[in-house]
Design a protein with these regions (language model features):
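Alpha-helical transmembrane signal-anchor/signal-peptide segments
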Residues: 4-23
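Short extracytoplasmic
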Residues: 18-50
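Short secondary-structure boundary micro-motifs
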Residues: 6, 14-15, 43-46, 103-105, ...
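A cross-kingdom signal targeting lumenal/periplasmic-facing segments of multi-pass membrane
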Residues: 48-184, 188, 192-204
Length: 207
């Protein structure tokens, strides 16, 4: 039996991605707020992330009510086992946060259901509920088994998929309120970008 070694990078066959222009600086009731920067990692961790991802984007948005949402997006052209996505659970732990209440869930959008993970990161008085998802190629998947399965599907065709990790978080002691605000933000963001960009950011809905 011949073993297929994935060599064709899907990223090389797709349009070049630019996270800075892909996600608008203002959309719906949201605009960039430069007063708060999303979680920054130490230089050693950043060097590791630079090996995994081709591009990263970190922004904070604020709405007219003064509510803030932090957005972090990372794009990698090679999402094989060699360069698996760096999960937020690991990032936050490395920065001294306690990570708890990790739950797999679904986020209903106007385009379909998005599989997400939710978790709570706590450091001192900082209570940061987080929603994130991963894409492998054109499909949003939960990290772990589903992620490996999607990588395998590409691997069987000799292809190496690209992928995204999208993290949305808020500093809020009320987790329910935080997740509701994050859901609204995500829905607004998906509405503000084109079909091609939405597929890259959140996968093909219904696939």
């Amino acid at each position: 039996t011949k073993i297929v070694t994935p060599t064709i990078k899907v990223a090389d066959q797709r349009d070049i991605i630019n996270l800075e222009t892909m996600i608008p600086s203002a959309f719906g009731d949201w605009k960039i707020d430069n007063s708060i920067v999303p979680l920054q990692v130490d230089p050693q961790t950043q060097a590791k992330l630079d090996r995994i991802y081709n591009q990263t984007l970190a922004r904070t948005y604020m709405n007219s009510l003064g509510q803030r949402v932090m957005l972090s997006v990372a794009y990698g052209g090679d999402q094989s086992d060699n360069l698996a996505v760096h999960k937020p659970e690991v990032c936050y732990l490395s920065q001294g946060f306690a990570v708890m209440k990790i739950v797999a869930g679904e986020l209903l959008t106007q385009y379909g259901i998005l599989p997400v993970k939710r978790l709570l990161a706590v450091q001192g008085n900082r209570n940061e509920p987080i929603t994130y998802w991963i894409t492998v190629g054109d499909k949003a998947v939960l990290p772990g088994f589903e992620q490996k399965l999607q990588q395998l599907r590409y691997g069987l065709t000799g292809s190496v998929p690209d992928g995204m990790l999208v993290r949305v978080s808020t500093i809020n002691p009320d987790e329910g309120d935080a997740y509701r605000l994050q859901a609204l933000f995500i829905q607004d963001m998906l509405s503000a970008i084109g079909v091609k960009e939405r597929t890259r950011l959140a996968g093909t809905f219904g696939a």
